[in-house]
Amino acid sequence: MAKNIQAIRGMNDYLPGETAIWQRIEGTLKNVLGSYGYSEIRLPIVEQTPLFKRAIGEVTDVVEKEMYTFEDRNGDSLTLRPEGTAGCVRAGIEHGLLYNQEQRLWYIGPMFRHERPQKGRYRQFHQLGCEVFGLQGPDIDAELIMLTARWWRALGISEHVTLELNSIGSLEARANYRDALVAFLEQHKEKLDEDCKRRMYTNPLRVLDSKNPEVQALLNDAPALGDYLDEESREHFAGLCKLLESAGIAYTVNQRLVRGLDYYNRTVFEWVTNSLGSQGTVCAGGRYDGLVEQLGGRATPAVGFAMGLERLVLLVQAVNPEFKADPVVDIYLVASGADTQSAAMALAERLRDELPGVKLMTNHGGGNFKKQFARADKWGARVAVVLGESEVANGTAVVKDLRSGEQTAVAQDSVAAHLRTLLG
């Protein structure tokens, strides 16, 4: 007997019971994006490897350890996308979307990183990302954060996420801070773990992200990034904070928040939760004004964020059990008796024409009334439409409310109107 082939570790199947809640959550997210005037862009999941090395940074964990990179049959180095911003910028440059234009874009889909799989962290995971190009003021940074806050309200999780903000300044200010931080770390090298010692010279700001308690204690005495900000970055950050306060959005300034990718400048932010154990970041982003030029385009201000959908689904299920998937079926059409199936299928097609958007399932495979009503219940139907031999003969159908148990005989020409009233 052949051995079963299973999914790759960390790359999960999502079954019908799970995809229903995903679809409802994604629908909520997309509705909010539409209300802000953002447009969808669809991007390839495979890109040329140099794109990510140039955008993310060659000495980041993502590039050094986590990317799925391979050579194709032409010998070209390709990579499964580990994040969406680089590909979105590449597409914007390639198709002339960015020069002297303002763009508000969003995308959704799978990303890939070779990490140790655990709850909320997978090797194939799904992100929804937003990217805005051509706007440089703090007002658009604030709008993105306000958009995410509207998501949390719509999903019923506002009380379980908190906003952390920081400014990492201009490239020049960050370089000055990097020198001061390295000088401090060199004085305390014996207190650093091996990972931090390596990062100290390759990407010292990432030491601020260390989860090692001893390193975190040491960093209490380290130079503060805020002390090295240029005046323009200070004004930008102050403007952002004022806008958020006016909008009633609470935040905490976290001077150790730097983000893990090299392309960020000025604003960085994260929405975090205590409800998912160690996987606390739900949504994160910031400003990356130099990335378009770095990837071959003209200098273009840009800001964006990405959100992990697996973590969002886990969070919604953990803290808002009232947020349930929509039922698979609204109406179940029951047919019993000789020669009723063709009449039932014809009625079902007519009802689909007259009730667009309503989910109607026709019984197949026979079965008595009891079995068919059990199937209707299994699929979550609110209403059953019943056709027996007598109903077919006299041109009627029985409409049964499966919640109250009330049923009414209705002329087939009036079934759609009756259902419209019943379903609200």
Swiss-Prot record:
One of its GO terms (cellular component) is cytosol. It holds the Pfam family tRNA-synt_His. SUPFAM superfamilies: Class II aaRS ABD-related, Class II aaRS and biotin synthetases. Its EC number is 6.1.1.21. CDD domains: HisRS-like_core (cd00773), HisRS_anticodon (cd00859). It is found in: Cytoplasm. GO terms for biological process: histidyl-tRNA aminoacylation. It catalyses: tRNA(His) + L-histidine + ATP = L-histidyl-tRNA(His) + AMP + diphosphate + H(+). Homodimer. NCBIfam families: hisS. PANTHER family: HISTIDINE--TRNA LIGASE, MITOCHONDRIAL-RELATED (PTHR43707:SF1), HISTIDYL-TRNA SYNTHETASE (PTHR43707). Belongs to the class-II aminoacyl-tRNA synthetase family. This is Histidine--tRNA ligase. The gene is hisS.
